[in-house]
Amino acid sequence: MAASPEVGAWHTVARRKKGPRSNNSPHAAARQAKAGLDQPDARSTSAKHPIIKNGRLQEPLSTPSQHQSHLAEIDRTYGRVRTAYTSSPSYAALEALVRTHAASHAPITRAICLGNGPLHAPDSSWDRRRAANIQTATFLALVELLTCDLFVGSSSSSHEKKPRIRCIFQEPLYTAADRAYLTTTLGCEVVDDPDALEHVTEDSLVWGVHMYHSVYGDILCRVAEPAMLVGTPWDVWDALPPDEDGRVAESLKGLAKMDASAEYDLFAFPQDEGHFTFCDTGIYWRRNRTMAAQDKPLAAENHVGENDGEAGPPEKEAQG
């Protein structure tokens, strides 16, 4: 698919033509790690040696005062990050993308967010906490733009509304404070790993930034054609050296099929300035099937009309 001209800071991504594989990219090591080529498969690497039981982080119980303190800290951090993001060129580019293409692409009624990392983790570095907060803020900003609901995910407005698009979060490393903040303050749902997959439908936005190959495989095995998938595009995976046992290639069959489908457009995700938060991230957005179905009869009618108006073979001149 040919790339379209840029509008602002975003553009449609051209599918990469087949050619020699290269491993010289500055992000090659990170891509190999993400593909599971140099470490065990996992759904999150946000903390050191966490104890996960039944898809949920096991952590020491907090006192009520500690819990409230954690919530206040999350609110301060998330509020600062969200305010900075919604004032940034990255947000403006995302807004332009959605406003331009929403009418011609699939509508979304629910949004599933996978593996953003914990908003509040005592042993987590600031970079990781910032990444978790900016991804969460960006995910909810995208939901806002898709619903034109300017209050979704904003805890500072006295007129705050619950999102019309149902938002479901899954992150095994969420703390109790993270869960409380997402559900009580932001009006979202949090489920245990891997229950979020049960909520994926063809009208879903699935958010999986920097996930392992098996996660994309699980998503697209359940629902082959979600309305939108935000994650690592096929060409990034395809540029990796082939794995010996074919495990990665098998997991990514669904993504390769989506990438090749004429039903999907692929857009580069607007970058988080000065950070690698959304490097190698794209938006697969399915075209609106209802509009496509309506366009077919119209195109056929126009084709018939054009044929009716075509000049036939020249008539022989009357001979006197």
Which residue stretches match the model-derived regions?
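Domain-level detector for long C-terminal conserved domains
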Residues: A2-A9, K17-D38, R43-S44, H49-R110, ...
